[in-house]
């Protein structure tokens, strides 16, 4: 059975790999010249199942108002003429309740924990190397209020059976010795010892090579224009003016997925949240992070690779704008300079931005659609690297009609209710150009 996977980021590539392992004949198509050239290229580098949390949380609407007035805020909103931006924001606000937060976080942690286990198995089976570390993640709280507010997250961790440790200042210095000199600005920390780190782009590139060995064909530099459909089936995909056919189709185009789905009458609430990262060469390994640090105040992750520090975070609701905002670089430099002033050379840092495909409830969209042979794997937000292996394995099981190892409840697009309009009344338009 032939499967056409659209997108070669970490989500598309893991989908292709697990589909090939399940015996499918797989082709991957992407407009870029290689795998992991967009959102997967320079993300924060953390595999953090326990910190899988939706942006839509109680208290966020009030915090957002304050953030808009701050210079170094974790969230910024740039008004556009795109009506989808405002519809998405309205949906997100509806998810900022305690009850919705609990449901959404459970779904995210469920998939993330499974994904971490799949990554462990993959590494054991293949020996894939990607500058990975298995030394946990430490979330830093600069205020007592932040530490107190962690109670709701800890409750979900306990419900999901995720190990954790609350740290005082001495505990922080024990797990991250380079922070010993700055613990005075911290109130405490939450550590998840089972979390991991690694270079997502390096992982994706090497997994693509392994997928090729399994028979997967990667076709780069090709423009995906639109899906051709009739009734409840996809007939093919228009690629560079030619109709390409398969038995099953997987849409893993991140923030661009809705553009291909809209002509089918499918409303997928996936919108880009623009993020930024700095990659800093390490000059003093003893003064650099041991693993991953999360700064709760600024919503920024600081991750240790072999000889580099990756500082990633921020969220701009700004449509598909990929311009580099110097103020965001200033913020990232300020944070890493605050915590690890002697760890790396900021003058040699590389600055990057990417679009995180985010759903209003934080949970990705993985699974079937109203079209019998079309499947989605998109909307992972800031957790594409964390959720990639589990999402790819889950999707392959669903397409193969095998019982997945975890519950897929609440993960497919049906959770949004009536997502399909009458497709025949929607004019097809080229996408992903």
Curated annotation (Swiss-Prot):
It catalyses: a D-alpha-amino acid + A + H2O = a 2-oxocarboxylate + AH2 + NH4(+). Its cofactor is FAD. Its EC number is 1.4.99.-. The gene is dadA. GO terms for cellular component: cytoplasm; plasma membrane. The keyword Flavoprotein applies. Pfam families: DAO (PF01266). Disulfide bonds: none annotated. Belongs to the DadA oxidoreductase family. The lineage of its organism: Bacteria, Pseudomonadati, Pseudomonadota, Gammaproteobacteria, Pseudomonadales. The keyword Oxidoreductase applies. Oxidative deamination of D-amino acids. This is D-amino acid dehydrogenase. One of its GO terms (biological process) is D-alanine catabolic process. FAD binds at residues 3-17. It comes from Pseudomonas savastanoi pv. phaseolicola (strain 1448A / Race 6).
């Amino acid at each position: 059975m032939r499967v056409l996977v659209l997108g070669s980021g970490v989500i598309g590539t893991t989908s292709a790999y697990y589909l090939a392992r399940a015996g499918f004949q797989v082709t991957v198509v992407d407009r870029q010249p290689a795998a992991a050239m967009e959102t997967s290229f320079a993300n924060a580098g953390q595999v953090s199942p326990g910190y899988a949390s939706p942006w839509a949380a109680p208290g966020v609407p009030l915090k957002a108002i304050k953030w808009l007035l701050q210079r170094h805020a974790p969230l910024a909103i740039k008004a556009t003429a795109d009506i989808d931006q405002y519809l998405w924001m309205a949906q997100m606000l509806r998810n900022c309740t305690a009850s919705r937060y609990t449901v959404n976080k459970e779904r995210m942690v469920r998939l993330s924990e499974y994904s971490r286990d799949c990554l462990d198995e993959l590494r054991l089976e293949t020996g894939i190397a990607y500058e990975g570390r298995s030394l946990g993640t430490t979330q830093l709280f600069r205020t007592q209020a932040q530490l107190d507010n962690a109670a709701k997250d800890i409750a979900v961790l306990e419900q999901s059976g995720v190990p954790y440790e609350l740290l005082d200042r001495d505990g922080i210095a024990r797990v991250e010795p380079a922070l010993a000199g700055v613990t005075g600005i911290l109130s405490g920390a939450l550590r998840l010892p089972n979390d991991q780190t690694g270079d997502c782009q390096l992982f994706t590139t090497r997994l693509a090579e392994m997928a090729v060995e399994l028979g997967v064909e990667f076709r780069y530099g090709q423009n995906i224009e639109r899906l051709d459909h009739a009734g409840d089936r996809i007939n093919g995909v228009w690629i560079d003016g030619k109709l390409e056919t398969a038995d099953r189709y997987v849409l893993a185009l991140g923030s661009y997925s809705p553009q291909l789905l809209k002509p089918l009458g499918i409303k997928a609430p996936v919108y880009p949240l623009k993020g930024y990262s700095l990659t800093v060469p390490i000059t003093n390994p003893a003064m650099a992070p041991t693993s991953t640090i999360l700064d709760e105040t600024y919503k920024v992750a600081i991750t240790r690779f072999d000889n580099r520090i990756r500082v990633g975070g921020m969220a701009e609701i700004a449509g598909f704008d990929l311009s580099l905002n110097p103020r965001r670089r200033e913020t990232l430099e300020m944070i890493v300079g605050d915590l690890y002033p002697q760890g790396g050379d900021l003058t040699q840092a590389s600055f990057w931005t990417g679009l995180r495909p985010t759903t209003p409830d934080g949970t990705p969209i993985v699974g079937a659609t109203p079209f019998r042979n079309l499947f989605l794997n998109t909307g992972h937000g800031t957790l594409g690297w964390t959720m990639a292996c589990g999402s790819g394995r889950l999707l392959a099981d669903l397409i193969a009609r095998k019982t997945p190892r975890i519950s897929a409840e609440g993960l497919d697009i049906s959770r949004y209710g009536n997502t399909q309009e009458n497709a025949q009344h929607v004019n097809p338009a080229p996408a992903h150009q």
